[in-house]
Amino acid sequence: MLLPKHHDTLVGIDSDGCVFDTMTVKQREHFFPAIIRHWGLEACADALRACAAFVNLTSKTRGSNRFPALLHVFELLPDYPGVRVSGATLPATDALRTYVHSGLPLGNPSLQAEVARTQNPELARVLEWSLALNDDIDARMRPVPP
């Protein structure tokens, strides 16, 4: 679809509500390292970064909620080159999958309630990751120039 030109400037809004592409910076500088750290995936870090970049930056799932995106990364990761031979222990995903498909609004408040209700350590780790990720972005995210 071609839009008719009405002005000399076009302002586009990114899928996370930003005028500038902060998503790439957030993913590469914050999300990817946090996943690696919280799940001890250093042995397959390159594959994790490639898989997470595909899911979060270049596929049709770009801009999706962090919890379904994390699940998708963990589901695809075993098939990435080098992962199986890396010796990395891949995360269990049953509880995350149940949460993602629960119909609950996906966010830290509902995840906190699910962790309290289920006492599931897998969900607790996801919550720890999500909260630490928010703290890291708040503390270290630099403004992205236009």
Model-flagged regions — what are they?
Residues 10-12:
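Hydrophobic "anchor" residues on beta-strands that sit immediately upstream
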Residues 2-4:
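Short loop/turn motifs at secondary-structure junctions and domain boundaries
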Residues 6-7, 18-146:
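Alpha-helical substrate-recognition element adjacent to the catalytic core
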Residues 14-16:
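Acidic active-site catalytic centers that drive phospho-/nucleotidyl reactions
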